[in-house]
Curated annotation (Swiss-Prot):
GO terms for biological process: protein refolding. It comes from Helicobacter pylori (strain Shi470). It catalyses: ATP + H2O + a folded polypeptide = ADP + phosphate + an unfolded polypeptide. Belongs to the chaperonin (HSP60) family. The lineage of its organism: Bacteria, Pseudomonadati, Campylobacterota, Epsilonproteobacteria, Campylobacterales. Keywords: ATP-binding, Chaperone, Cytoplasm, Isomerase, Nucleotide-binding. This is Chaperonin GroEL. It holds the Pfam family Cpn60_TCP1. The keyword Cell inner membrane does not apply. Forms a cylinder of 14 subunits composed of two heptameric rings stacked back-to-back. Interacts with the co-chaperonin GroES. PROSITE patterns: CHAPERONINS_CPN60. Its EC number is 5.6.1.7.
Length: 546
């Protein structure tokens, strides 16, 4: 297929048009008074959202060069959301402002490479000032404030996230699911839970709840399939002398072994339950080791030279309480040594840092949570499917932003942090590097101006008023008042501001230093020709029919 090439100003102007259109659609969602955007879907009802990245993801433009510009900035919004959970609209507004200012200067003759260098130096200096101005998240109240702002000022969501983080800790896993009703709920699972239930309902101790509960129990862990009773008989006799319940976690228990266990359980000879080991393949082995560390036991594996026939009671794990239903097993109050658990947690954290697979990272984080904190499930309720999807997106974003705040700290919100940081930056640059520096200094005012405009105020007036002051002074767009942002709880995670600025400068630099674009030429589909009617002339002979 033939391709068209655009050069220099012609290419950059078309790229800018794409960025402008994306920016104009996304910017209206910014701030506490941001507006909704209605998005048509290929099937089903249209979706309504105030989430900038959701709007950006839907945008495809008809002009191929303009579309390339839009797609690059869309990528910035997505990457900002992935890394920090929030700040997608901030990144888009910054990218547009930097590109607009930069394009004006480059068209007037500035050197794009020198301009880029100045922009990079200015951004780095502002980020350093942001870090100096940040403070660690103090407690539950500040976590609630961050989560509330990221959830588009929904205080109920903010409180749920703060409650969840308080209960499972910073290493715990918090997942978001759809509730069956319209109310939001929080479920917290204490201890380690994995998705394997009892192998036989005859192990149940509570017929009403259909659960098996074992108190002060031993836990046998093996990666072997148990099919013969003689494999585990010596160990069963030893545990019977201790008079404690036993949970068997094995690859599988079948045939004679399972039947014998059930019969002895029903006769009251053994207080026992059996479940399959969680996970598959190598992950199963690692999860068995996790349970062993948590309970102070040892995985009986032939790889380690251990067999069930020769296993001793010392190899068994111990737990204060074990609850098993038909789908899940929960181990509470494992008796493992705390230093062993800490070592295992550190090992998993190292694996998380080094893995490149999102799936592996998610599974490792689940294992980390089960060992160190726990698992909380936020169940989001809504009256309609459209509202449910929009609300679930907001909760996901708020959760990521809250984790970012705990990780790197917080700064004043409402677009004021960037202005405060810029006020403290004074770089002695020359020529076109200075032009790049000044571009950033002007562009960082754009987020605050846009928040004010969306709330119905004059952006320029608000920016000037904020610039006159120092410290935590900023603009509360919810009520139009100038306040101490920290005292009012108007805060942003440092990570969100940092990544939004870094990504915006990165994509703007790429666009400003673009000298040519290559795209396919859309071929017009030819209109099908009318069929040849020449053969109809023979119909003249039909006159003889009169």
């Amino acid at each position: 297929m033939a391709k068209e090439i655009k050069f220099s100003d012609s290419a950059r102007n078309l790229l800018f048009e794409g960025v402008r259109q994306l920016h104009d659609a996304v910017k209206v969602t910014m701030g506490p008074r941001g507006r909704n955007v209605l998005i048509q879907k290929s099937y089903g009802a249209p979706s309504i959202t105030k989430d900038g990245v959701s709007v950006a993801k839907e945008i495809e433009l008809s002009c191929p060069v303009a579309n390339m510009g839009a797609q690059l900035v869309k990528e910035v919004a997505s990457k900002t959301a992935d890394a920090a959970g929030d700040g997608t609209t901030t990144a888009t507004v910054l990218a547009y402002s930097i590109f607009k200012e930069g394009l004006r200067n480059i068209t007037a003759g500035a050197n794009p490479i020198e301009v880029k260098r100045g922009m990079d130096k200015a951004a780095e200096a502002i980020i350093n000032e942001l870090k100096k101005a940040s403070k660690k998240v103090g407690g539950k109240e500040e976590i609630t404030q961050v989560a509330t702002i990221s959830a588009n000022s929904d205080h109920n969501i903010g409180k749920l996230i703060a409650d969840a983080m308080e209960k499972v800790g910073k290493d715990g896993v918090i997942t978001v699911e759809e509730a069956k009703g319209i109310e939001d709920e929080l479920d917290v699972v204490e201890g380690m839970q994995f998705d394997r239930g009892y192998l036989s309902p005859y192990f149940v101790t509570n017929a009403e709840k259909m659960t098996a509960q074992l108190d002060n129990a031993y836990i046998l862990l093996t990666d072997k399939k148990i099919s013969s009773m003689k494999d585990i008989l010596p160990l069963l006799e030893k545990t019977m002398k201790e008079g404690k319940p036993l949970l068997i976690i094995a690859e599988d228990i079948e045939g004679e072994a399972l039947t014998t266990l059930v019969v002895n359980k029903l006769r009251g000879v053994l207080n026992i339950a059996a479940v399959k080991a969680p996970g598959f393949g190598d992950r199963r082995k690692e999860m068995l080791k996790d349970i062993a560390v948590l309970t102070g036991g040892q995985v009986i594996s032939e790889e380690l030279g251990l067999t069930l026939e020769n296993a001793e009671v010392e190899f068994l794990g111990k737990a204060g309480r074990i609850v098993i239903d038909k789908d899940n097993t929960t181990i509470v109050d494992g008796k493992g040594h705390s230093h062993d658990v800490k070592d295992r947690v550190a090992q998993i954290k190292t694996q998380i840092a080094s893995t490149t697979s999102d799936y592996d990272k998610e599974k490792l984080q689940e294992r980390l949570a089960k060992l160190s904190g726990g698992v909380a499930v936020i169940k989001v309720g809504a009256a309609s499917e459209v509202e449910m999807k929009e609300k679930k997106d907001r909760v996901d974003d708020a959760l990521s932003a809250t984790k970012a705040a705990v990780e790197e700290g917080i700064v004043i919100g409402g677009g004021a942090a960037l202005i405060r940081a810029a006020q403290k930056v004074h770089l002695n640059l020359h020529d076109d590097e200075k032009v790049g520096y000044e571009i950033i200094m002007r562009a960082i005012k754009a987020p605050l101006a846009q928040i004010a405009i969306n709330a119905g105020y004059d952006g320029g007036v608000v920016v000037n008023e904020v610039q006159k002051h120092e410290g935590h002074f900023g603009f509360n767009a919810s009520n139009g008042k100038y306040v101490d942002m920290f005292k009012e709880g108007i805060i942003d995670p440092l990570k969100v501001e940092r990544i939004a600025l870094q990504n915006a400068v990165s994509v703007s630099s790429l666009l400003l230093t673009t000298e040519a674009t290559v795209h396919e030429i859309k071929e017009e589909k030819a209109t099908p020709a009318m069929p040849d009617m020449g053969g109809m002339g023979g119909m003249g002979g039909m006159g003889g029919m009169m």
